[in-house]
Amino acid sequence: MTVPATRNDLMIVNMGPHHPSMHGVLRLIVTLDGEDVIDCEPILGYLHRGMEKIAENRTIIQYLPYVTRWDYLATMFTEAITVNAPEELGNIQVPRRASYIRVIMLELSRIASHLLWLGPFMADIGAQTPFFYIFRERELLYDLFETATGMRMMHNFFRIGGVAADLPHGWIDKCLDFCDYFLPEVAEYQKLITRNPIFLERVEGVGFIAEEEAINWGLSGPMLRASGIPWDLRKVDHYECYDEFDWEVQWQKEGDSLARYLVRISEMIESVKIIQQALEGIPGGPYENLEARRFDRVRNIEWNDFEYRFISKKPSPTFELSKQELYVRVEAPKGELGIFLIGDNSVFPWRWKIRPPGLINLQILPQLVKRMKLADIMTILGSIDIIMGEVDR
C-alpha cells in the first residue's frame, strides 16, 4: 500500500542492483514525492543459484562447499546447520572437544560478520574512518581461520559428527591474544561512534520496529532483539555447548537503527567472553566420531570383498538419511538460519528447505522506508544487515 502523495509529478528511482551503497545485487524501485519515499519495491533473484535443488543431488559432504556461498561473510554458520541436520536425523553424538571447537569457530565468525557489517554501515551514513578500522581486526580473525582451517573464507571445516581437523599447536594461545587485543578495540569503536552527534542524527528514531510488529513479521536475530525481545537460539535451543558458558543475551527496547547497532556491538563483546571461556576449558579427546560408526557397520559395507566406504572416507563419506523429517536452526549473526530436511533412506536429501534470516528480515523494508527521506533508505537497509547470497540462494 502506497502513501498518499502531495504532488502529481512523482519520481521513480532505481536503486541498485549496481549501486555504491547497495549490499549485494538488490534492486529497489523507489517512488518519491520530492525527497519523501511513497513506495518501495524490492526486486530479488539476481543471485539465485538453485541451492536447494543442488542439495537434492549431493551427499551432505559433497554439498558442504556449496553452503559457504550463502552467507559468505559468516560461512561457519551455514556449515554448522548443514551438518547439524543429518546429525539430529541420525542421532549422532558429537564429542565434547569437537563441540567446543565448533563454538569457538562460530563465535569468531559472528565477530567477523558483525565487523564487516559495522564498517559498510558507517560508510553508508557518511563515516569513512571505521570502515578502515574494522579491516584491521578482521585480518587478525582471518589469520586465525586460515591457520585452523586452511582457508580465510569458505572454510569447509565442519563435518558430520565433528570437525575436519583438530586445532593446530599454538592456535589457542594465538586466539586468546586476539581476544585480549580485541576488547579495547570495541571500546574504541563505541567511543568514536556511539555518542557521535552526527551518527545519532542519522540513526536515532530511524527505521522503528515495535515489539509486536517484529513478531508478526517473523524477524529474528539483532532485528528482533533490538525491538525489546531477548530471544536468542543459543539460550532457547541449548545446542552445542553454549549452556556451559557464562554470557548474556544482548537486547534493546528502542527498536530503531541505533538499537540494532548497539545490539551488534554488544554481541561482539559477548562472543569474546564465550571464546575465552571455551579456550580455557576445552577438553581433550577426539574431534570427530565417524570412525567408530564405520567399523561398527563393517559387515554391511562390503562389495566384492572390498571395503570401498573406508577408502572413500576423506573425499566423500556416504551417510544415509533415514525416512523422516525435521527442522534444525542456529543463531546466525543475521538471525535464525534454519534447514527443513526430509530424508528418504538415501544418501541424498529428498527435500532441503533453507530458512535464510536475511530474506525474512528484508520483507519489512518497504514498510520501514515509507514516509522517510530518500537518504534514510540506506541507513535502514544497512541496519537490517543482509547478504544477497543467502537472500536469493
Swiss-Prot record:
Its EC number is 7.1.1.-. Pfam families: Complex1_49kDa (PF00346). GO terms for cellular component: chloroplast thylakoid membrane. The keyword Transmembrane does not apply. Its main location: plastid. Keywords: Chloroplast, Membrane, NAD, NADP, Plastid, Plastoquinone, Quinone, Thylakoid, Translocase, Transport. It is an enzyme of class 7 (translocase). It catalyses: a plastoquinone + NADH + (n+1) H(+)(in) = a plastoquinol + NAD(+) + n H(+)(out); a plastoquinone + NADPH + (n+1) H(+)(in) = a plastoquinol + NADP(+) + n H(+)(out). Disulfide bonds: none annotated. It is a peripheral membrane protein. The keyword Cell inner membrane does not apply. GO terms for molecular function: NAD binding; oxidoreductase activity, acting on NAD(P)H, quinone or similar compound as acceptor; quinone binding. GO terms for biological process: photosynthesis, light reaction. It comes from the Eukaryota. It is found in: Plastid, Chloroplast thylakoid membrane. Belongs to the complex I 49 kDa subunit family. NDH shuttles electrons from NAD(P)H:plastoquinone, via FMN and iron-sulfur (Fe-S) centers, to quinones in the photosynthetic chain and possibly in a chloroplast respiratory chain. The immediate electron acceptor for the enzyme in this species is believed to be plastoquinone. Couples the redox reaction to proton translocation, and thus conserves the redox energy in a proton gradient. NDH is composed of at least 16 different subunits, 5 of which are encoded in the nucleus. This is NAD(P)H-quinone oxidoreductase subunit H, chloroplastic. It comes from Amborella trichopoda. The gene is ndhH.
